[in-house]
């Protein structure tokens, strides 16, 4: 096995038993692939597949004018280059986007000619606004903030059959319904009512009998009946009535007379119920006719109109019930044949017939008018309007589209074999749906499960962006159609016709304010990756929290391997927001697929297939952990399998597929929880959610007990610097890494240098700190894909969210009562949980009516001390340490002119104009904040003079630009001269550069020449002269290219900033705030075991073991049994073993043991006790020593979910580390030195500090803002509000009889406006009395009562 650069430095001991059949796929693929497909940027325009952006244009163009004399056609599009790179966009607060230019063709037809001859063609490129680009990490930068577009899970287009589960009608009767959902267009619903008539609704409006829709489609009553029913034929001859017998139709009926065969033998006696046995006998006897009494036909419904044979008069319309009167009429008219509908109560109900009876319409026009009235109530219907409306509803491609996916689902559901077809509905489609619905009501067929993942699909970024784009284009289409008629007369060009604003606005609105465009959760790498892999059922066209029931939220069997059953938020969104499983992907239709290994006749192959939930249903799927022998044959007599969405057992030869990996069930976050299989699901849910809230600590510390997924997350999240091409590290410092690319990785014309600029102390969306640290040294050889730099929360290329803490499970002095956590002071001293938070504070100078607001250090009425951290421009220095209330940016605002008092006039006369004209509106440090200024950015409007600070920042940026370019040129030049040196060495010179003819070139000769003189050499061989010329030209070209780059970047830096209207200048100050852990901060493990720090004890007081090693954290053992998250105990034991082994290695290194001894011990650790074997033989002695040095703090272990370490392996590891196999040890109280009465579980657990810090939550108020209406103080820290003294607290004071305290609470401390003002004044004067008055809420109550029309007044005595 080949190890990467970082893996060689620290190998994780892996306990997995199952081989890796398939690597975890790239975790951001769902976002990147979808948007790449949307833009189709790399494709050649002529050959673009009709998808996404191209499809949106194709669906709207060509646009033809109302007269038909002009048309605008779409030819193709191209994307420009972005104006700024991602970092600059974040800094400047602009959108990372590219201009979209569309080539359109305007065709003008000759009005005079009859066959539409083309008169004129104009082709032009039109600017269609900007399209945001996705960064390589799957995010968008919109107005300077990183956002993620969350994928949406919605109901797939197609047709669905369902029932109301008996909830609608009091009798509990099941009412069946069918719904045709298009991709875009009107929904069509069919539903039964309690009386078993079928109704139709369009777009959930008022219901109409379904027969109205059938009539509108052009079906007559007779055609409808023929479509849905078979008929019974009766022959009348005189007084006799005989039925053409189809024996099966008699099933279940009671015989009204004896039924004989031809011989007269009675087959069924009168009054007996006809059974299947009787039917068999009738069929054998070949009875074709059955004489029945005249009453037999009563109550039946006619299938065809009954016509008088002589006069042609219609005696009864079709769908008429046979009555005695009608029967007499028929007999009189000597009608010889009647056809009635065959219906029964078991499997052929009279539903459509009953519906026709309640239908008031009789022909197509009436039906169309009825539908028009329902859709447009109040408008007078005309024939044309009614027809147009109806055709536009379901039969117009512009207004209605099932989409290829919807058509496929539709055809499959109604039993057709072909899966392709038109995007609009046909008459046959609607009839087929009604037939299927009636069949289901008759007991044939089953309803659909709408929560099945075969009926729900995922809409990704690309698709949603395309839909928004199409919306914009449709708006453009309307405007263009109107202008097209003028195109010919006024000689307009395409550019004059198209206004791109609606498109740009639609795209901007989607990316800026759609419910699914979310502010990226950037707490740590895991939260970023999880946010991008999220699937939401909310959003436009989705569910709403209030309406979603239990079924939608619940885990469904089809979630297996597609959606994580564990990771979902707690609270109102539970089950509506899900996470993709680790191996899941979407197929071309947007359904989630999961990978499986193919199994043939009990033998497992390595072939992998991806299947959607529908395709998988018929397969028999074994679990990844099914037992196999060396020949990959399943060896159990019965294998645990999934089949038809049920869990069962089957013989090995029946198995057709097998899971790829045990962790394919869960999401990325859940697969990071070691021993997940031992945790209760509720706690695992909390664990996977809380990992996303972990704040990156000052020094990242890899988990001693992990799952092996840590490396994947760190690599795929994009937070680490990953090698793009192999090569050698040329230079490295804290801010960048320069790599000389290996020759075999460079293609002609490509750069030979890769420069990686590292991100230093940057603010994330959640105000945590982003900082990258290099892992490589100069001269190191690195391969493509190696990790070269860590970021916050990664350690040597592995995700590291928290710290490994030595913990003890014991109750101790009540400090860990109710999940509290007791910490040792050592944790604070060693800065284990110290985090850096970066806050951005912004000062905006606007233009005012009274004059511009100015950023200056000349602030009125402020002492020198307050200004000593500001420069002459009035902006704080970088590096200044500031506290609450300190001025960061001095700003003054002009005051309005008021009448001056004599005193003010005198002051003016003495001190001049300026002093009193302005008021201080400086940017100050908010309360409760203390930190260091780490960066200042100044943005100035074009045309406004830059201040000294802005010029200094600009100069600094201009000095930085050439560094990378010069570095690149140096390496390119050096590599070129190296190649020339090897080519020229030993060759003969013809002259030039001061060398004599015939001189043989050596290294000394070349060293004596300047670089420029090399190219003056004339060589004896022409090929070498040519090579020298090419090399010279190459260096000149590179220099020119780099100079052009420099000029571009210089222009970007020097140009003014694009600021909002009225804004002259913006100053952004970045404060770094260091937060140590303190009581009140929230901490958690990875198993949902969360708690608040209650006390930080001195190290000497903490419990310690016999060697005197104190524990860092004391947790309450009572938090484990009831929560059932036993995984934390196993993690603690294995963590102890990992640390013990590390200490053992450390002792060996201190004793300076030989590499061979270390190799033996490491082989014992990695290869003796279960799990994956590591090939340490390929390591050199130096590499073994480097590995051992990195393992001193503990040997990291990986215990993958559902395939982790067993109890015996943990014991073996503890034994190898010379530790008690129980994992428990005797502890002593640090304060009394007394031994605790029983051994205590001690070990190492990975603890996280969550982003719920007491500093952010603590808040105090004396006076502040008040609510406008009630005049009561506002609530919450953001509004600087007060604490609510609620009704229960009032009851408490009433119960105590504390009358004065109560009066104070309800008046002067709340909403007695005059009283509180007076009291404040009194306190200032040192007088502590209060005079309570009338509370404002009483006035509000009076106003409320008056608003009800009741006059109420307070009488004053």
From Swiss-Prot:
SUPFAM superfamilies: beta and beta-prime subunits of DNA dependent RNA-polymerase (SSF64484). InterPro entries: DNA-dir_RNA_pol_bsu_ext_1_sf, DNA-dir_RNA_pol_bsu_external_1, DNA-dir_RNA_pol_su2, DNA-dir_RNAP_su2_dom, DNA-dir_RNAP_su2_hyb_sf, RNA_pol_bsu_bac, RNA_pol_bsu_CS, RNA_pol_bsu_protrusion. Its EC number is 2.7.7.6. GO terms for biological process: DNA-templated transcription. It comes from the Bacteria. One of its GO terms (cellular component) is DNA-directed RNA polymerase complex. PROSITE patterns: RNA_POL_BETA (PS01166). Belongs to the RNA polymerase beta chain family. NCBIfam families: PRK00405.1, rpoB. This is DNA-directed RNA polymerase subunit beta.
